Amino acid sequence: MKLFIDTANVDDIREVASWGVLSGVTTNPSLVAKEGRDFMQVLREILEIVDGPISAEVISLQADDMVEEARQYYELHKNIVIKLPMTAEGLKACARLSAKGVRCNMTLIFSPNQALLCARAGAAFVSPFVGRLDDISTDGIQLIRDTAEIFDLHGIDTEIIAASIRTPGQVVEAAKAGAHIATIPPKVFHQMLKHPLTDSGIERFLKDWEAAKGRV
């Protein structure tokens, strides 16, 4: 399973990219607004850091407007992926953009039916929201599992991005359920680094090393 980072913070992207684990980036209007910066400039900086799919989300609600808004993004670089909402208008825009060879990431997926519609509209990626389903006592990982089963059964090439990830455990479960990608907030990336036995093991190695030096 590939790992994307879900943020518009360039410093966070640069930090996690330095670990050698990133394959792409996802953003959304809320993340962009949080940074308070010009989005086109942010995209240019991200493109210099990560050589992989970079999802840029439109804010328009009508298909014609979505397609027009998307142009400024996909003309910027071949790695830009257009992120569209799972609506009838979003599907129309996806079909039109995909026909031009523009990759689309359909977001706000909460059912296998929605994922299937997006795949048939030509989406390169679908983004089921794990955490938000868990918030309403629904099994978000089961959505990943069901979608992966349908795609495998029918030879659908659309990649599944496990989104709305809240914990390291959800990353593992998404991988086991068949997600091709997990898009992960910076905070969860840092949590994935940690284990108490790793910390205590490093501390013990250092103590043993110092003790050995003292005996020389």
UniProtKB/Swiss-Prot annotation:
Statement: the UniProt record of this protein carries the keyword Mitochondrion: no
Keywords in alphabetical order: Cytoplasm, Pentose shunt, Schiff base, Transferase
Record Gene3D superfamilies: Aldolase class I
Family annotation (InterPro entries): Aldolase_TIM (IPR013785), TAL/FSA (IPR001585), Transaldolase_3B (IPR022999), Transaldolase_3B/F6P_aldolase (IPR004731), Transaldolase_AS (IPR018225), TSA/FSA_arc/bac (IPR033919)
Pfam family, one: TAL_FSA
Reactions performed catalytically: D-sedoheptulose 7-phosphate + D-glyceraldehyde 3-phosphate = D-erythrose 4-phosphate + beta-D-fructose 6-phosphate
Domain of life the protein comes from: Bacteria
Enzyme class: transferase
Localization, UniProt: Cytoplasm
Active site: K83 (schiff-base intermediate with substrate)
GO cellular component, one term: cytoplasm
EC number per UniProt: 2.2.1.2
Entry's Gene Ontology BP terms: carbohydrate metabolic process; pentose-phosphate shunt
Predominant localisation class: cytoplasm
Pathway: Carbohydrate degradation; pentose phosphate pathway; D-glyceraldehyde 3-phosphate and beta-D-fructose 6-phosphate from D-ribose 5-phosphate and D-xylulose 5-phosphate (non-oxidative stage): step 2/3
Keyword flag Cytoplasm: yes
Gene Ontology MF term list: aldehyde-lyase activity; transaldolase activity
NCBIfam families cross-referenced by the UniProt entry: fsa_talC_mipB
PANTHER family (UniProt xref): TRANSALDOLASE
Function: Transaldolase is important for the balance of metabolites in the pentose-phosphate pathway.
Family indicated by similarity: Belongs to the transaldolase family. Type 3B subfamily.
Record's protein name: Probable transaldolase
Top-level taxonomy: Bacteria, Bacillati, Bacillota, Clostridia, Eubacteriales
